[in-house]
Amino acid sequence: MENSTNFTQPTPPVVNTQRRSFLRTVGAAAVTGGLLTACSTADLQVRPDGARAAAPGDVITLPGGDLGILNYAFVLEQIEARFYELVLANPYEGMTAMEMQLFQDLRNHEVTHRAFYRTALAGAGIPDLTLDFSSIYFRQRTDVLEAARMFAEIGTAAYNGGGKYLTDPENLAVAGKIVSVEARHVSIIREMQYMNQTAFSGDNIVIDGLFIKKEPSEVLPMAQKYIRETIDARNLPTTVA
């Protein structure tokens, strides 16, 4: 794949090691707790054939209610987890040991989130999606960091915008824990990207960062670019119960 970006790679920054240590501690506890108790029997129609993997061209219809919102989150977690797996499988030129460790931490968080939804939703969960990241040039540091920030920001906005539709307090608590991790991902990626000590806690992060929110109807078209199946979200709730 050709690289259409023609400029000199910047010198990678030295990322604050205390922040890296903090990042490593926030992911593990984020998905403990609630076990999707609001998922009704009527909702358990996402995967009637019990298949684990989808095929390109399939239409995957999300259900309504809490189960629909949780599967919507599962879509996003699949994208993020696979993205970081590919970042580490195809490290860009000049990736420092510190950056490698940060990406490993980010991957571990997202893989944990993906595994949580896969296990908790079980037969009511969507299949494993066929993902396409061909638009991202993984050998270019700037492309990788821009994509990482975009995925983290979309994830944060999606949880903030979709959480209000969850009717069970335990499900909402789990979503709240995960979105706090996503918001911290945004901050650490911004520090890597902009190479200064204010990017981690700039005004737009401290003041506005936790209040960025998007509806599923805004998020899924952005996510669809990376999914070879079609996600049908017509059943997702659009009003607060």
Q: PLM features: what roles do these ranges have?
A:
Residues 2-16, 26-28, 41-241:
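All-alpha RGS (Regulator of G-protein Signaling) helical domain and cognate RGS-like helical scaffolds
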Residues 29-34:
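Bacterial N-terminal signal peptides
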Residues 37-38:
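C-terminal motif of bacterial Sec signal peptides marking the signal peptidase cleavage site
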